[in-house]
Swiss-Prot record:
Alphabetical UniProt keywords: Selenium, Transferase
Protein known as: tRNA 2-selenouridine synthase
Source organism per UniProt: Escherichia coli O6:K15:H31 (strain 536 / UPEC)
Catalytic residues, chain numbering: 97
Top-level taxonomic group: Bacteria
Length: 364
């Protein structure tokens, strides 16, 4: 039964998106997991806690005995059936626990008794996690070109279309602004970092990569923050700035934040609840910058937002949103970005409209 335990093995698992059957407790999995992992725990949270207390009070033998007592009979068979089904569905997968210790070996032995030989990760999640951290440190040393520009300039799409681009906002499941949330909840910080490392490893492995193309992000993307090693390199990177006409930017923002988000919410929740979720999403975004707008201006824009939502609900038109979006861009987002860009003006090496920046990036 082949085990995987070298640095190159760990990297190969991440590059190949190898299915991982993670047998840690749900609370451990939620704190951090690998991108291709599914959680089928040997013990649930309560069982794990009880075994942990027993270990501290009575030692390892007593804890092991308690674990076997808690996971026995029908419960044990149900879990074996779930692991067996996952193994059959993912014949090239691998087992994983916290450190490649007793839990994954117990599951491996029970599966063997059930007629399935399945490898495990020696070193477990901890070894994979260290590999992800080290890979990010190493790969961040390659040169970086940042794509900058005001809100609505299509920076994310430009990055997505580059073979050496990494969509940080897509990985973070957040678009990096007050209105940046998506319908997918953000990952834990460790899971986000693991996903980023896997994406960088895959991108680097599939081409002769000379430099990274990333969006000009702040340290935080929603609740996730960029790894310090990557953030430090980004502060030293050259910047290409997209400068599209205001009208083009408005078209993009209308498509992304009004048409698409309304569609996504109604698709996920149905027409009635989806509409309420969509309205709450827009109001929450505006409310998040209330202090910076000032109470009077916030109240004015919130009233315009309400009017625009009423128009959209009755006519289907999103044109009414321009009444609050345009001043929000002109008075808040654009001045804020230009101020930030002025502080790193010496790093700007190219300016142009979207297509011009895309061509310039390809030539690098």
């Amino acid at each position: 039964m082949q085990e995987r335990h070298t640095e190159q093995d760990y990297r190969a698992l991440l590059i190949a998106d190898t299915p991982i059957i993670d047998v840690r407790a749900p609370i451990e999995f939620e704190q951090g997991a690998m991108p291709a992992a599914i959680n089928l725990p040997l013990m649930n949270n309560d069982e794990r806690a009880a075994v942990g207390i027993c270990y501290k009070q009575q030692g390892s033998d007593a804890a092991l005995a308690l674990g076997h007592k808690l996971v026995a009979g029908e419960i044990r068979q149900q879990r074996i059936d779930a692991w067996r089904a996952a193994c059959l569905q993912n014949p090239h997968g691998i087992l994983c626990c916290a450190r490649g210790g007793q839990r994954s070996h117990i599951v491996q032995r029970w599966l063997h008794d059930a007629g399935i030989d399945y490898p495990l990760v020696e070193g477990g999640y901890k070894a994979l996690r260290q590999t992800a951290i080290q890979a990010t440190i190493e790969l961040s040393q390659k040169p970086i070109v940042l794509i900058g520009g005001c809100t609505g300039c299509g920076k994310t799409l430009l990055v997505q279309q580059q073979p050496n681009g990494v969509d940080l906002e897509g990985l973070a499941r957040h678009r990096g602004s007050a209105f940046g949330r998506t319908l997918q909840p953000q990952l834990s910080q460790a899971s986000f970092e693991n996903l980023l490392a896997a994406e960088m490893l895959k991108t680097d492995a599939h081409q002769d990569l000379r430099l990274w193309v990333l969006e000009d992000e702040s340290r935080m993307i929603g609740s996730n923050h960029l790894p310090e090693c990557l953030r430090e390199r980004m502060t030293q990177a050259t910047i290409a700035v997209v400068e599209d006409p205001f009208e083009i930017r408005l078209e993009r923002l209308n498509e992304e934040y009004f048409l698409r988000m309304h569609h996504d919410f109604t698709h996920a929740y149905g027409d009635e609840q989806g509409w309420q979720e969509y309205c709450e999403y827009l109001h929450h975004g505006l409310s998040a910058i209330k202090r910076r707008l000032g109470l009077q201006r916030y109240n004015e824009l919130a009233a315009r937002l309400d009017a625009a939502l009423t128009t959209q609900l009755t006519t289907g038109s999103t044109d009414g949103h321009l009444a609050w979006l345009v001043p929000l861009l002109e008075e808040y987002y654009d001045p804020m970005y230009r101020y930030q860009l002025e502080k790193k003006a010496e790093k700007v090496v190219f300016r142009g409209e979207w297509a011009e920046v895309a061509e310039w990036v390809k030539a690098q």
